[in-house]
Amino acid sequence: PKVMGIETEYGITVRNQPDFNPILSSLLLINSYETYRSSRIRWDYEAESPLRDARGFEYAEDKDVPSKEESRLINLILSNGARFYVDHAHPEYSSPETTNPRDCVIWDKAGERILNLSRSRAEAVSPPEQRILIYKNNTDFKGNSQGNHENYLMDRKVPFARIVQYLMPFFASRQIFTG
C-alpha cells in the first residue's frame, strides 16, 4: 500500500488587533492546544538537519533555525501521530501517515477540529474584542498562497539531478491526469 498524508497550511489573522503579528498569533494557537493536552511528545531530529540541502550540501549555521527550546515551543507531535506547528508565519497541520484515502480525509478533518479547539482556547485568553480567524486553502495579503502541499520520501543518496530528471516531467504533466 502507498503511504499518504495531508499537510495543510492555514492562514491566520486576528480581528480588532491593530498590531497583529502572525507568528505570535500562530504560537498562541499552537500552545493553546498544548495547554489542553497534558503531555508533550518530543520530535526527534537526530537524523535530520534543517541546514542539509537535497542537492547534497549543508548550509553554514543559520540564525533563523530555531534552537531546541524554540523548536519545542513551535512544534507539537499529537497523540494521533500528526504534527501541529508554526511554519514561518502560519499554523500548519500535518496528518499522520495513512494507507488509504478515507483515513487521510478522517485525519484531515481531525486537524480542522484541532485548529478550531485551539482557536477557541486561544480566544479565551485574549482580550474579549479580539477574534482569531483561521483560513484553509487561501492566499495572504502579500500574494503568498497557503494550502495543501505534497512531500515525497526518497533516499538522500539519490543525486539531485536524477530527482529533477524524473520529477519535473511528472510535475509538468500531472494536471492532465489529476485535474
Task: Name each model-derived stretch.
Residues 15, 155-157:
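Short coil/turn motifs at secondary-structure junctions
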Residues 138-155:
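Histidine-centered divalent-metal-coordination microenvironment in nucleic-acid enzymes
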Residues 1-135, 144, 164-179:
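Terminal catalytic/cofactor-binding subdomain
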Residues 159-161:
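A short alpha->loop->secondary-structure connector
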